[in-house]
From Swiss-Prot:
InterPro entries: DNA-dir_RNA_pol_insert, DNA-dir_RNA_pol_RpoA/D/Rpb3, DNA-dir_RpoA, RBP11-like, RNAP_asu_C, RNApol_insert_sf
Record's catalysed reaction(s): RNA(n) + a ribonucleoside 5'-triphosphate = RNA(n+1) + diphosphate
Source organism per UniProt: Bordetella avium (strain 197N)
A GO CC annotation given for this chain: cytoplasm
Statement: the UniProt record of this protein carries the keyword Transferase: yes
NCBIfam families noted in UniProt: PRK05182.1-2 (NF003513), PRK05182.2-5 (NF003519), rpoA (TIGR02027)
Its EC number(s): 2.7.7.6
The name this protein goes by in its record: DNA-directed RNA polymerase subunit alpha
Molecular functions (GO terms): DNA binding; DNA-directed RNA polymerase activity; protein dimerization activity
Pfam families: RNA_pol_A_bac, RNA_pol_A_CTD, RNA_pol_L
Keyword Transcription: yes
Xref: SMART domains: RPOLD (SM00662)
Domain notes: The N-terminal domain is essential for RNAP assembly and basal transcription, whereas the C-terminal domain is involved in interaction with transcriptional regulators and with upstream promoter elements.
Length: 328
């Protein structure tokens, strides 16, 4: 079957919106292809982009993440949260262990981390903590290359290593894509007015540009669907890979705290044992409205935050919760 009759985009425009933020406009597409390709690219952009993140930390004098450090104003939990906001970029390596040492009063920044020549910090002014006059901070930070979002408890289960006292395993958000959404608008070519225009709105953390993110996601999509183009007649055999446990979208494994809801909304969800985004999207609007202290305003907030990630309430998930998912 020939595909020559299908329209392909003749125009691709990149409209910068801000630092690491752009709108990418493509047109024309056959009717319906805007949603087909836009949704596929959005899901790949959110879950499958390669990036870098701190995965383990060891601090001098710290046994566990609920400790405090004399002379440091923030507790260890806050330090770890701030550390997750540091954007690393590794060149020609998949992992590295970095050192941070700081003494005396002042603000500790990402730029205080000692870097080898092939490691870069995209946001060196990012704050990590504050020290008093007698303060002293020393830590080892392991940074790894990966995809999507991997909870620390899942990584701990998959690793066959002796647990070291003071070794803190972090939830790792590798994805360099912070936000992505798409819209489909009407397009026209000559007398045809039933065509689609696809608008991708992408913001990254600076490790890659929005344009490069789209290129990488398109390559992943092409690679995955190329197997279908290789299918031939019924008499020809095709050896499919052995299927294991169906993979869960890494976005669904993120805690609801990552949605940055108001404290009231977040507490209401946790009171109903909703700890992960995968828990939340399976609830319906009516179920959430029955939650004590969660009103229509909070519900609308939740719906808006989910919509920004291409998710909705009332979705059905198979094999949820995944094996090994820890409950607080």
């Amino acid at each position: 079957m020939s595909t020559q009759g299908f329209l392909k985009p003749r125009s691709i425009e990149v409209e910068p919106v801000g630092p690491n933020h752009a709108k990418i406009v493509m047109e024309p597409f056959e009717r319906g292809y805007g949603h087909t390709l836009g949704n596929a690219l959005r899901r790949i952009l959110l879950s499958s982009m390669t990036g870098y993140a701190p995965t383990e930390v060891q601090m001098t004098g710290v046994v566990h993440e609920y400790s405090t450090i004399p002379g440091v104003r923030e507790d260890v939990v806050d330090i770890l949260l701030n550390l997750k906001g540091v954007v690393f970029k590794l060149h020609n390596r998949d992992e590295v262990t970095l050192i941070l040492r700081k003494n005396g009063s002042g603000l500790v920044l990402a730029s205080d981390i000692e870097l080898p020549h092939d490691v870069e910090i995209v946001n060196p002014e990012h704050p990590i903590c504050n020290l008093t006059d007698a303060g002293k901070l020393e830590m080892q930070i392991k940074v790894e290359k990966g995809r999507g979002y991997v909870p620390g408890n899942v990584r701990a289960l998959s690793e066959d290593r002796t647990h070291t006292i003071g070794r803190i395993i972090l939830d790792a958000s590798f994805s360099p894509v912070r936000r992505v959404s798409y819209a489909v608008e009407s397009a026209r070519v000559e007398q045809r007015t039933d065509l689609d225009k696809l608008v991708l709105d992408i913001e990254t953390n600076g490790v890659i540009s929005p344009e490069e993110a789209v290129r990488q996601s398109a390559r992943i999509l092409m690679d995955q669907i190329s197997v279908f183009a290789a299918l031939e007649g019924a008499g020809d055999s095709y050896e499919a890979p052995v299927r294991g446990t169906p993979q869960i979208d890494p976005v669904l494994l993120r805690p609801v705290d990552d949605l940055e809801l108001t404290v009231r909304s977040a507490n209401c969800l946790k009171a109903e044992n909703i700890y992960y985004i995968g828990d939340l999207i399976q609830r319906t609007e009516n179920e959430l409205l029955k939650t004590p202290n969660l009103g229509r305003k909070s519900l609308n907030e939740i719906k808006e935050v989910l919509a920004a990630r291409g998710l909705t309430l009332g979705m059905k998930l198979e094999n949820w919760p995944p094996l090994g998912l820890e409950r607080p």
